[in-house]
UniProtKB/Swiss-Prot annotation:
Belongs to the methyltransferase superfamily. PANTHER family: GERANYL DIPHOSPHATE 2-C-METHYLTRANSFERASE, ZGC:194242. Pathway: Amine and polyamine biosynthesis; betaine biosynthesis via glycine pathway; betaine from glycine: step 2/3; Amine and polyamine biosynthesis; betaine biosynthesis via glycine pathway; betaine from glycine: step 3/3. Catalyzes the methylation of sarcosine and dimethylglycine to dimethylglycine and betaine, respectively, with S-adenosylmethionine (AdoMet) acting as the methyl donor. It has strict specificity for sarcosine and dimethylglycine as the methyl group acceptors. Optimum pH is around 8 and 7.6 for sarcosine and dimethylglycine, respectively. The pH optimum appears to depend on the buffer used. This is Sarcosine/dimethylglycine N-methyltransferase. Keywords: Methyltransferase, S-adenosyl-L-methionine, Transferase.
Amino acid sequence: MATRYDDQAIETARQYYNSEDADNFYAIIWGGEDIHIGLYNDDEEPIADASRRTVERMSSLSRQLGPDSYVLDMGAGYGGSARYLAHKYGCKVAALNLSERENERDRQMNKEQGVDHLIEVVDAAFEDVPYDDGVFDLVWSQDSFLHSPDRERVLREASRVLRSGGEFIFTDPMQADDCPEGVIQPILDRIHLETMGTPNFYRQTLRDLGFEEITFEDHTHQLPRHYGRVRRELDRREGELQGHVSAEYIERMKNGLDHWVNGGNKGYLTWGIFYFRKG
């Protein structure tokens, strides 16, 4: 039986990503491997190529990855990053994710690609990670923390399960530190949350938890570029979604993508790659 979560925001996120509409949309439009923001060389590059480039760039920052490494992916989606890391480095990965539907796709693709012996897919929320203290060499996350109603708790959990000297590499769509009050409300309404994280929030919270910031690669311009690219792909391939994704979902998605693009272009949002090391 699928777990239900008491926190409404967590349960809302779980139900959204478990829905047939969302599952089919991300599989058809986004590609079904990586469902996060991409690093684009040009505006019309395939979404899957740009999304994979983000994974490649993040992994290139790590000094821990190798056959003896143990990685936790917090909010793993369909597990594309975990499979990339397992294939390239031979490391073991715990792919923790809220959506049971996504996790079933993840397990199937792991088997098809011959890496199921390296990847454990875990049905769980990252507010309560079901692993012992200090067992991971690298904690990894892509564009997932924004869905949490308690990001400070998520960061405490990341710190708890990471060994001393371990790495924390993540991305998250964030509210800019100087964002005017109230202007991102349409985005918050879409993701059913009251707040978004900011760069200062992540820096201060992780500093208090004993982390050293190694670098932040600011790729803010890629956020509206990515959501604009998804919007155009949706317009181009909308006919393929008929019978798989409801008209209501498609209309909400178009509106949501437009809000992300507008917020990014106006400087209200920021995005990039954080790289921290635990002391």
